[in-house]
């Protein structure tokens, strides 16, 4: 891939060698994160984000971050209607994509012993908000009602291009849970 002189200058200012591999850092002994983070996975319904093909991506499906005082923050990356192999499911069917997206987020939460009652915020990206917002709001309201959510999470809806043209909706979420909660697989109790 070709880099411009300006791009190389910015990379060098960050201590990244423009000619080296993507992970090459010229500053040995760089500090680690001050707060431990653990990747969240739900392989029964979602592939690892880094396994997308044909293009590689650089993000995690979610992170588990201890906040102290027995609280844990779950940050779930934008999630859409994809299967365990990373393939889009329900192309062209907004409502079915919305239900699959909610299913995928539910499995990510369950992998950490969390539920939708732990969600404090969502950000919802809709490809065509004028066309699909009615269906979006109907499905979300039906789901939240079925889950018994009261209060409902804080939320923002944004019209946005999503990473693939056949994906019509993507949702990211933030949850807070108590450390050691029943069901938190492999976590401190």
Give the residues covered by each predicted segment:
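N-terminal presequence-like segments and the immediate start of the first folded domain
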Residues: 1-103, 107-120, 126-189
